[in-house]
Amino acid sequence: MSQNSLRLVEDKSVDKSKALEAALSQIERSFGKGSIMKLGSNENVIEIETISTGSLGLDIALGVGGLPKGRIIEIYGPESSGKTTLALQTIAESQKKGGICAFVDAEHALDPVYARKLGVDLQNLLISQPDTGEQALEITDTLVRSGAVDVLVVDSVAALTPRAEIEGEMGDSLPGLQARLMSQALRKLTASISKSNTMVIFINQIRMKIGVMFGSPETTTGGNALKFYASVRLDIRRIGSVKEREEVIGNQTRVKVVKNKMAPPFKQVEFDIMYGEGVSKTGELVDLGVKAGIVEKSGAWFSYNSQRLGQGRENAKTFLRDNPDLAREIELALRQNAGLIADRFLQNGGPDADDGDAAADM
């Protein structure tokens, strides 16, 4: 047998294309059609299907027009930074297209009134409030394998408490239990997520590493597995308040695309999240319009095509809210200049010390 195989390798007259064809047909007989293919010549390859985040600026910063389907997404940040709001807005955008969405509420903290204000159709939203981390991830796996769900949100990784920890005593030390649970679950989930074309969004919290002298002491919960399996990682931060006279009516928010397997990462975008409303679309039109040179700013005045929008940003936002046709026209112009705006985002947010964990695993 060893002599025959040696002759086969050394025989220069063997037609490699026929040998490859035979090998490919054998693989397809064993594992099914489509189990191996040529990347460039396959006619069934389709464009990346995406779902909007509800923020025009973030959709542009992501490079593909939104969050990609059939992928794992991680949204992380400090408390009250807008993580759940961003996930709920993505659900609302998916439902507008007729998508079926699910919300695994491990924190038992979903506010249905707020979700409705963001545009979520509660009648058609599947919700689960599991008791343990194993139960949450089993429900996630079952829904993904069904192939019927478009967007599934797990809120949050930190709340996925292993059964052994819940059943144990309060002071028991169980190191690495949650990290092992996440690692095992993601190994199972990743193939079925791709086949079912389901987007799975994991919301995560931030913890501080003790004794860090250099670099950022921040890290996310649940071990390192999610950092590797996620195709997109978004770092969301509250950077200020939106005020109307003395009353705080929203948060100024910054989102950094820390990891992106679909397009160049490290783009950074800022927008307002208004209380009871979500992402301020008119605020984005003003800010992105100025950045792209579509909206002119002269002193405190904003204008578009020689038409004045208002004095001051809030007045310009109000004018666009009252004139939806003009707002749509500016949005269309912004989408046509998406490449230019994306380049500006890249200039604003290169990799820094805070991205140490993320940049290493791309």
Swiss-Prot record:
Residues that hold ATP according to the record: G77, P78, E79, S80, S81, G82, K83, T84
Superkingdom of origin organism: Bacteria
Pfam families referenced in this protein's UniProt entry, alphabetically: RecA (PF00154), RecA_C (PF21096)
GO cellular component: cytosol
One Gene Ontology molecular-function label: damaged DNA binding
InterPro entries cross-referenced by the UniProt entry: AAA+_ATPase (IPR003593), DNA_recomb/repair_RecA (IPR013765), DNA_recomb/repair_RecA_CS (IPR020584), P-loop_NTPase (IPR027417), RecA-like_C (IPR049261), RecA-like_N (IPR049428), RecA_ATP-bd (IPR020588), RecA_C_sf (IPR023400)
GO BP terms in the entry: DNA recombination; DNA repair; SOS response
UniProt keyword terms in alphabetical order: ATP-binding, Cytoplasm, DNA damage, DNA recombination, DNA repair, DNA-binding, Nucleotide-binding, SOS response
Localization terms from the record: Cytoplasm
Predominant location category: cytoplasm
SUPFAM superfamilies hit by this protein: P-loop containing nucleoside triphosphate hydrolases (SSF52540), RecA protein, C-terminal domain (SSF54752)
Protein task: Can catalyze the hydrolysis of ATP in the presence of single-stranded DNA, the ATP-dependent uptake of single-stranded DNA by duplex DNA, and the ATP-dependent hybridization of homologous single-stranded DNAs. It interacts with LexA causing its activation and leading to its autocatalytic cleavage.
Family the UniProt entry places it in: Belongs to the RecA family.
Protein name, per record: Protein RecA
Organism of provenance: Rhizobium etli (strain CIAT 652)
Gene of this entry: recA
